[in-house]
Amino acid sequence: MIVTLIEKVYSFLWGDLVQIPLPGGSTLGISLLIILLIPTGIYFTVRTRFLPIRLFPDMVQALVEKKQEKNSLSSFQTLIVSTATRVGMGNLVGVVAAISAGGAGAVFGMWVTAIIGSSTAFIEATLAQLYKEKDPLYGGYRGGPAYYIHAYVEEKQKKKRNKVVISVLFAISGLICWCGISQVISNSVVSSFKNAFSIPPIYMTVVLVAVAAVIVLRKDATVKILDMVVPVMAVCYFAITILIIVMNLGSLPGVFARIFEEAFGFRQAAAGGFGAVLMNGIKRGLFSNEAGSGSAPCAAAAAECDQPVKAGLVQAFGVFVDTIVICSCTAFIMLLAPEEKVTGLSGMDLLQTAMEHHLGRFGVIFIAATLFLFSFSTFLGILFYARCNVAYLFGDNWASQTAYKVLALVMLFIGGLAAYTFVWDLGDVGIGLMTIFNIIILYPQGEKALKELKEYEKEKRK
């Protein structure tokens, strides 16, 4: 019953709403989410006058902003939290899923989401800063789409409201999404360790949940652990992927050719059609960089900034690095392996087989260990996101915060034993619904973020 419902909602959100015929008999399938995301990204890219390119130095500079309050987060720390979820699961499992379903051409779709998604990420993160509030439970600040949607409705209706329907729907969708991601995490880790060390799924699932419980049920552990783990694991993973690319430099032009040939239908891709290829890439690009979905603003709101724009610049930088740099590295690891060795494989089997080709047994063990660490960072990151949404729905009390953490741990356990396709569908449904509710408000509320950008640039010119 639940599986059937999830599949139907998934088809509505991600299924082909429009079919455009293309030369050669192929078709371009466009889903509801793509119809929302791509025009929104283009619109804000134009309105910000190509901010990701113009203000790239400002993005880097914003990372070193210092915080003044003890319990608040610096801009760099909020980037660490959002990067934990982006670089964690999205760059490994998300890229694997995109290429498994859509072939090499899906990588091009992911690049598209990053280029235009950076501007969307800037707008939503800036709004999160504008409408943040003090967090009486954890200290510091909290906010996100549920809060700036609420503020927009109050401003329009000119009266105070306890709850706003769209904000409630967004918060619930977020909790569904993050429960789905929890299952993807354990599903991928269990599969990886089974391939690397022949550990039965039930044993690895129990260990994963037990270690996660020790961390997440402590009040102040999340950001501290992420501060330690994320920079180290990202640098190590990046170094290994660069090594593999250098080892296969001669094959690199062929990989680029394959990406573009499959993306534009010149070569038959795994999913069979031009539309399906781009669909998978764009969908996984969203899952990876989160631009437009409303996830990262939950972290951006926690930053202590002297100007809201700086939080937006940090998150725009995160989208660029996440997809253009790190996602591409993962894609190249798989695509630089001989096609005959990875044909027919999916999930972590595909990535581990590719790593074994490049680095032998060490590659398999490295990916298993990396995925374990990435998964923990992702799990901690999504629980950080969930804080503000749980608080919006249930108020300031520890009972509801703890209850959601326990629910997430249960989902982590179920995911270790569930079917691969279903756990992805649940996450896709949640992030799809979040995106709809978020983007509906981004157009009218985005004007305030654009006004802040003008003030920021005016101040710079003085």
Role assignments for model-derived ranges:
Residues 40-45, 113-141, 150-187, 191-215, ...:
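Helix-loop-helix module between adjacent transmembrane segments
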Residues 69-101, 127-130, 137-153, 169-172, ...:
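Alpha-helical membrane segments and immediately flanking helix-loop junctions
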Residues 116-124, 204-219, 230-250, 283-286, ...:
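Selective recognition of specific alpha-helical transmembrane segments in multi-pass small-molecule
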Residues 124-136, 242-258, 272, 302-305, ...:
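Extracellular/periplasmic helix-exit of transmembrane alpha-helices
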Residues 50-75, 97, 103-106, 119-161, ...:
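Flexible loop linkers connecting adjacent transmembrane helices
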Residues 1-89, 99-106, 117, 441-462:
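N-terminal alpha-helical transmembrane segments of multi-pass membrane transport
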Residues 47-52, 91-95, 177-190, 211-225, ...:
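Transmembrane helix-loop junctions in multi-pass membrane proteins
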Residues 36, 44-60, 166, 187-193, ...:
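Membrane-interface loop-to-helix entry segments
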